[in-house]
């Protein structure tokens, strides 16, 4: 296990608790933390699971059971769920001449980029990497940025635009990865869309971040900030819980050349300007080592000698957590792929964080797996996408890129696919007869208690005080049971109480009793309509344009 090197790296530093997060977690004075680089693959430490807050605030968002943070005691079984692929995938593919490379490679899929729902325009919007052989002819493999839109997230069109040659290309810079962020908290309309483009630097052909702004996601201004040179597969995310922009950068360690480093700043322009490659043995003021692959990563069955790596890592706020999307590389190396005419194996895995830095991974099975069937759109090299998931009714829409096995060029033929999951449906706690779950001490300022649950038998909720004593009027016997109901938003009431407003200001515990039921989440809302005040990731139809789950008219 990594040891936090406060005293070694910052002499005289004390770990006085300073910043307190929305959920009660205290951050140490040294932030982001500086860990020593390990010599072997290992899991990232998650300090807040070892030392929880005395009282956890549940004011923000639906509370998910993706880790043990909320749980004091339970006999329930944790079940990990994965999404179902849309039967008509891919939803977007390379069908234009201007999406080919000079050697005919086909590309039409995000490489992080972004898929968002814009509540103001009431459209699904996608930015993606396209082959740029008709413009950048100096190399076999060059790329620029295309744009597509949809009314339902399943049927996409590529509009004719006035940017480049009456196509759907919105940025012509020679690029690799990119992050397009629809910043719903941005007050300056000109900066509502942010592009963090990993572009070729003309002078020495190295990669660097260039930050650009747009008011509509189509017409982009000139760059306003640039980084030093970087490794290609780097990305950016916004952590709204702490109001910081974080750079997730490829980084080499003794464990793997596919590890990650981290940089954060409240100003996206400064974040980009501080980014650069790290020289070994010299500490950097802003950039810290982040994590390596885990020793639990799956290995390629055909190439078991290949040590897995983290090809990319994206993240986004969903409800009360930061959702981490890992593109886990399992090999083989490019030279072997080219010789065999196959795609490298990248699959998408999930992790969850409550402080935006330490991510817990409850499963090392793919969340979105490749399909090594001839003709499959996702035979190999699946990559995560920014903005994902989108909230569409009771479902979450997860998009990813995939690459088809082909005879044109081994690394080409990218397209975009969709998979759907129940809202909050990452993890459920399942109970048969006599099942229960007792939370840690909670504080709240809402009024109405809701659950997301699939109840084939029954579910009761009891409210207890901080000492574990059931509160009169809120006992299990007084609870109106939920029976044979499957809802992503179910109000909990008691015989004499329609809400728990009378308990505001008290420290409470919740005890859930399950009989043949699964519970995915609970939350306490100010509104009887059940909005959670959590973050809605890439957004969705009927949601608030603020990116926060509040009544749409607020």
Give, region by region, the residue ranges found by the protein language model:
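Accessible peptide chain termini
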Residues: 1-2, 255
């Amino acid at each position: 296990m990594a040891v936090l090197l406060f005293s070694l790296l910052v002499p005289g530093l004390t770990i006085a608790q300073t910043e307190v997060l929305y959920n009660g977690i205290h951050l140490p004075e040294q932030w982001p933390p500086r860990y020593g680089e390990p010599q072997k693959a290992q899991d990232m430490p998650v300090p807040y699971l070892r030392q929880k807050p005395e009282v956890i605030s549940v004011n923000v968002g639906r509370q998910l059971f993706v880790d043990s943070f909320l749980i004091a005691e339970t006999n329930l079984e944790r079940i990990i769920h994965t999404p179902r692929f849309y039967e008509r995938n891919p939803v977007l593919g390379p069908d234009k001449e201007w999406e080919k490379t000079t050697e005919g490679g086909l590309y039409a899929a995000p490489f992080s980029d972004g898929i968002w729902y814009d509540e103001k325009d009431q459209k699904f919007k996608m930015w993606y990497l396209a082959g740029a052989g008709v413009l950048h002819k100096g190399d076999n493999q060059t790329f620029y940025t295309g744009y597509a839109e949809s009314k339902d997230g399943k049927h996409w069109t590529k509009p004719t635009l006035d940017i480049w040659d009456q196509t759907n290309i919105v940025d012509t810079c020679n690029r690799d990865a990119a992050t397009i962020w629809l910043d719903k908290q941005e007050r300056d309309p000109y900066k509502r869309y942010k592009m963090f483009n990993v572009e070729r630097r003309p002078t020495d052909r190295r990669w660097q971040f260039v930050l650009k702004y747009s008011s509509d996601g189509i017409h982009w201004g000139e760059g306003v900030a640039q980084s030093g040179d970087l490794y290609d597969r780097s990305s950016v995310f916004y952590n709204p819980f702490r109001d910081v922009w974080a750079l997730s950068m490829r980084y080499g360690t003794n464990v793997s050349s596919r590890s990650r480093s981290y940089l954060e700043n409240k100003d996206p322009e400064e974040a980009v300007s501080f980014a650069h490659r790290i020289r070994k043995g010299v500490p950097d003021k802003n950039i810290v080592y982040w994590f390596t692959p885990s020793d639990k990563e799956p290995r390629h069955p055909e190439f078991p000698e290949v040590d897995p790596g983290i090809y990319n890592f994206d993240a986004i706020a969903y409800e009360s957590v930061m959702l981490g999307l890992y593109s886990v590389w399992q090999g083989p190396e490019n030279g072997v792929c080219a010789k065999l005419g196959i795609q490298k194996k990248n699959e998408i895995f999930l992790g969850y964080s409550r402080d935006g830095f330490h991510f817990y991974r409850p499963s090392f099975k793919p969340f979105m797996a490749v399909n090594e069937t001839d003709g499959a759109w996702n035979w190999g090299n699946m990559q995560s996408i920014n903005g994902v998931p989108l909230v569409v009714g009771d479902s979450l829409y997860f998009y990813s890129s995939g690459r088809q096995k082909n005879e044109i060029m081994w690394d080409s033929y990218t397209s975009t696919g969709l998979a759907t999951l129940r809202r909050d449906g990452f993890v459920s706690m399942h109970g048969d007869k006599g099942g229960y779950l007792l939370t840690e001490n909670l504080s709240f300022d809402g009024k109405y208690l809701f659950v997301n649950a699939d109840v084939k038998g029954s579910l009761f909720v009891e409210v207890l005080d901080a000492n574990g004593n059931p509160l009169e009027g809120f006992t299990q016997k007084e609870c109106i049971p939920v029976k044979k109901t499957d809802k992503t938003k179910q109000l909990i009431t008691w015989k004499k109480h329609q809400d728990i407003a009378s308990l505001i200001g008290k420290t409470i515990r919740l005890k859930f009793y399950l009989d043949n039921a699964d519970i995915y989440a609970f939350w306490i809302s100010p509104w009887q309509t059940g909005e959670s005040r959590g973050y809605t990731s890439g957004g969705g139809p009927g949601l608030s344009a603020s990116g926060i789950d509040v009544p749409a008219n607020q």
